Amino acid sequence: MTKQTLRIALFTGLYSPFLTGVSVAVHQRVHWLLEQGHEVFLIHPQINNKFSKQVGKRPMAGLEELQSFANFSSYAFPTEPLIFYKSLPQPLHYRHWSDTKLLEKFQPDIIVVEEAAQMRGLYSAFLQGYGRPVGVDYAKRTKTPIISVFHTDIVAYIRYYLGDFLFGLMRPIIPLLVKQFSNAYTLNIFSSREQLSKYQKLECLRGEYVPYQGINCEKFHPRNICYDPIPNDKRPTILFVGRITAEKNVTQLLDAYPLIAAQIPDVHLVIVGSGPLDQEIRRRAQKFLHGVTLWGESHGTELLGWFARADVFINPSVTENFCTTNNEALASGTPVVAAMAPSTTEQVTVGYNGFLAQPNNAQDFAEKIIAILQNPELKAQLSAQARPSILEFDWSVCSQKFEDKLYQLVGIPQIVKSSS
């Protein structure tokens, strides 16, 4: 018996060397599908001279790794920098390239669109982007199933950047936009039950929970302490890993730090990542001298070492959708203190593998972290329970569920009799 292979066209608005959680997840997903024998056509953003040289030099797994598979092909669509975030791409308008022509040539069994709203132009308030739902024209004409993979809580982003007043003015049209976006696709899949519920209340059509967003639990592991980037530093370590942007609420880290340091003077806050707020955060961190380290980007075993070394992982963002770094920390045996948001309640069980803090409340974050660091018995208990709590989201398990959904939508059996 052998597995029936599929021809899968996968569009993504973000991919290596553009560093985001979406980019990393897409690469892992495509790699896994190729390992299963499926033919994958990856349509991804082009890296060109409009972006800084630093972007193109990131040591990320990408096309070179996938090109070793005979069943892989790709196309880099033309891009320009996102006007609000110059290190991330936006596709050029459909006048410049045709998703339909690409699909006509490949003739997929199913189309997957990752971060569909971003590709269409929502991240730039429609000032940029493709200008129409990606892949939908071909899907409708050929009756090919097409799914949208939901990554970003866009409504939370809108509220965060516009503020409550402007968001209140815009709120009446949000359900109309959500309904229009979701109606274009055969299925819209969410990795968080709470996020699905939120968007269903906003008129999302054909939404379904599929736990596609896993992590490699064999890769992220407590044993990675052997890769500790600062092995001679014995201070208790609070770790943040992510983009240094406003929506990640990174400034909350520096609001909470002095409150923690007042109780634990030798505490060390390490911020790993880069982004538009990098210089502002560095300027603010100067007053804490050696208590706060802005490490910059981290990759490979060094990053694994940070997750395993940390005593507590902190995530103040309220815009996450089943946050990957939360899971990576837990798999590494590190308790998490995260902002209370729809998806974090599915990752963090209060008092079991970490704590949830009130959003935008530095005092509450500080109290939760102090409680862990001042109580070795509690810290040991949370650490011991962190990894088992997240094993159900191992990458292989989640990828299998994603593949099952593809077979269901295509309507062919997974297993066929071998010719022998």
Annotate each PLM feature.
Residues 229-258, 270:
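Conserved donor-binding/catalytic core segment of Leloir-type glycosyltransferases
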Residues 318:
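Aromatic "clamp/platform" in nucleotide-sugar-dependent glycosyltransferases that forms part
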